[in-house]
A protein has these predicted regions:
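Gly/Ser/Thr-rich phosphate-binding loop
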Residues: 319-322, 349-353, 362-428, 441
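Conserved AMP-binding/adenylate-forming core of the ANL superfamily
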Residues: 33-36, 85-86, 99, 103-157, ...
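Structural core segment of the AMP-binding/adenylate-forming
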Residues: 161-237, 563
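Conserved ATP/PPi-binding loop(s) of AMP-dependent carboxylate-activating enzymes
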Residues: 435-439, 450-484, 523, 537, ...
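Conserved pre-ATP/AMP-binding loop-to-beta segment of ANL
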Residues: 99-101, 224, 240-261, 268, ...
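Conserved AMP-binding/adenylation subdomain of ANL enzymes
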Residues: 280-298, 308-349, 364-366, 441
Length: 637
């Protein structure tokens, strides 16, 4: 990766940025002072963020934080009463822009629709009233299994408005993945649709799960955008017969609002919990202050609501009273440059995208980009995985015309935003992060808890809690401590390998665990492996991700077949597609006699991954069966 300075902020940009206004609000001289003070006192930082962003409370908080039970259990905005909907919708009602368009939406076939803030407010009240009529109450979990429709956002905010907890699920999940998450969360309701389209293929979303929903004992109601009738089904059209007048529920600032599942390397999916104050405060700072998002911006991020970025997008735009563009389907169909044409058409000023999208776009015919007018773009935010030099420069030069700053960020579902970012007051290097996010107390340590040297890799950690940090894991306090606060005792260990150069620029070098990320979507090996094992056609299986230039990782399944198994590779590919969705289809299935294991029978995915990537597997002295390595190596990609 090139280490030269490639972008410099202008004096005008610095002077007019929200970051400068925030620094002045805090009575500080510059970003260096902000960074230093917030590192030692994150409570001071978040108190100022809340006040600067004019976040509203029904009852003011008496104290910004309480960490008396230990840093992992830090509580925020003590005794405060609020609601995400209060800060994303209600507080805008007296503003002129409330009659303006909030969401522009396009279906894959090009059909357009839109909704104003005023209309949106009435619709979420109708849906919220219906939920209450059907017996849903504060604290109940209601899932969203929907594509990028306006109705998805209406349901999302309606659930929050009545104090229920929203559980967004990736619209590409198969039935097993959906049912497992519904059961972990003990969901009482689910919003879904009859169908959507992806690359001209009709996806029958409700059909994919309806025959398995009886496995969710807690489920009481299905809210369906479609015409199918049934015992538990409430059809979307019936929402229109309900009152559009509904008071927003007053919730404790720390009440659960959103559950986003993320996958680790072992065990069941982990439910990260966002609070009513946590996400909106984090987005107000990360995107509003640091990435300069304003009420006049138009936002586009083609992310599924099932991922953290979906909640992030909904909150960024609405909390600022801005406009957003959503689109059914994918960024490169039916037009190869659909994503950029959406920016051109709607004059998008602020977009968020992944390196995976750019790797796919940069190999297309350069003529496709020649006549695009992307002059409305003033900010490009990126995240999800580390950059390599060539795609970063392509984005900067071809799309941004070497003028638009690329706001690289790194964080994740567990922190509801970023730990590292690019500060608009400092120069940018290719693919780097020129600063840690204030209020995150970020550092790089070795496993002994010691700071690493310049350019040395170590674990990305947080020394203190953050307002947006997950409130434990849903119904799993032990796993929360074991996974995040015990690797290096009393530090949050994020699972990313990081380094810092002599100029203070930070870099990521991939995950320090075995989580597989495909085009920005994360999945744990155990989820893939369990699908194969339960078929009875495999004795053992190991799922690993091999680096891929286009989508981040290729999924490779190494299978020890069951006796008398005559199934082909396609059989196992189809199993994964059915249960987990097409996004996680294996790129290759290999059959082997044995898998490398330690003496306590732990499968060594690190060794398998290295062999398949044709790399040195390192120390094999702990292996029970080192002879298995050569067979794996013979299948190297």
């Amino acid at each position: 990766m090139s280490k030269e300075i490639i972008w410099q902020p202008s004096k005008e940009l610095i002077e007019n940025s929200k970051l400068t206004k925030f620094i002045q609000y805090c009575n500080l001289k510059n970003y260096d002072e902000l960074e230093k003070k917030s590192f030692s006192d994150p409570g001071w930082l978040w108190d100022n963020v809340i006040k600067f962003s004019d976040l509203k409370f029904y009852k003011p908080y008496s104290k910004i934080l309480d960490d008396s039970k230990g840093i992992p259990w830090t509580r925020w905005c003590i005794e405060g009463k609020t609601n995400i909907v209060l800060n994303c919708i209600d507080r805008h009602k007296d503003r002129e822009f409330f009659k303006n368009t909030f969401i522009y939406a396009e279906r894959e076939d090009g059909k357009e629709s839109s909704i104003t803030y005023e209309e949106f407010d009435k619709q979420i009240s109708k849906v919220g009233n219906t939920l209450k009529i059907n017996g849903f109450k504060k604290g109940d979990v209601i899932a969203l299994y929907m594509p990028q429709f306006i109705e998805t956002y209406i349901a999302y905010f309606a659930i929050l408005k009545i104090g229920c907890v929203v559980l967004p699920l990736f619209s590409g999940y198969g039935s097993k993945a959906v049912i497992e998450r519904l059961n972990i969360a003990k969901a009482k309701g689910i919003f879904t649709v009859e169908k959507t389209f992806r690359k001209a293929k009709e996806i029958r979303m409700f059909d994919q799960i309806k025959n398995e929903l009886d496995q969710v004992i807690s489920l009481e109601k299905i809210f369906l955008f479609g015409k199918e009738k049934g015992n538990k089904i409430f059809n979307w059209e019936n929402f229109q017969n309900v009152s559009d007048n509904l008071k927003t529920e007053e919730t404790d600032a720390e009440d659960p609002a959103i559950i986003h599942f993320t996958s680790g390397t072992t065990g069941k999916p982990k439910g990260c919990v966002y609070t009513h104050i946590g996400l909106v405060a984090k987005m107000s700072f990360d995107e509003g202050v640091l990435a300069d998002f304003k009420q006049t911006d138009i936002h586009l991020c083609m992310a599924d609501m099932g991922w953290m970025v979906g909640s992030k997008s909904a909150t960024i735009a609405s909390a600022h009273g801005a406009q957003m563009v959503i689109a059914e389907g994918v960024p490169d169909f039916p037009d190869e440059v659909r994503f950029w044409k959406l920016i051109e058409k709607y004059k998008v000023s602020w977009t968020e995208l992944s390196p995976a999208l750019i790797r796919a776009q940069m190999i297309k015919d350069e003529k496709l980009f020649k006549d695009l007018d992307l002059s409305s773009l003033r900010m490009i935010c990126t995240g999800g995985e580390p950059w390599t030099e060539k795609p970063w420069k392509w984005l900067f030069q071809v799309i941004g015309k070497s003028k638009v700053p690329i706001m690289n960020s790194a964080g994740g579902t567990e922190v509801s935003g970023s730990i590292l970012h690019c500060c608009l007051h400092r120069p940018f290097k290719v693919g780097s992060f020129n600063a840690p996010i204030p209020g995150m107390s970020a550092d790089i340590l070795n496993l002994d808890g010691q700071k690493v040297s310049t350019n040395e890799m170590g674990e990305l950690v947080m020394r203190k809690s953050s307002i947006g940090l997950t409130k434990s894991l849903w119904n799993d306090d032990k796993r929360y401590i074991d996974n995040y606060w015990s690797v290096i005792k009393d530090y949050w260990v994020h699972g990313d390998l990081a380094s810092r150069d002599a100029d203070g620029h930070w870099y990521l070098h991939g995950r320090s665990d075995d989580t597989i990320k495909v085009s920005g979507k994360r999945i744990g090996p155990s989820e893939l492996e369990s699908v194969i094992v339960k078929s009875g056609k495999a004795k053992e299986v190991a799922a690993v991700g091999i680096p891929d230039a286009n989508k981040g990782s290729k999924i490779i399944l190494s299978i020890v077949p069951a006796e008398n198994n005559d199934q082909k590779e396609s059989f196992f590919e189809d199993l994964v597609i059915k249960d987990l969705g097409k996004s996680f289809k294996p790129d290759k299935v290999i059959f082997v006699k044995d898998l490398p294991k330690t003496r306590n029978m732990k499968i060594m995915r690190r060794v398998i991954k290295s062999c398949l990537a044709n790399q040195d597997p390192g120390d094999l002295s702990t292996l029970l069966n080192p002879e298995s390595v050569e067979e794996i190596r013979s299948h190297a990609i």
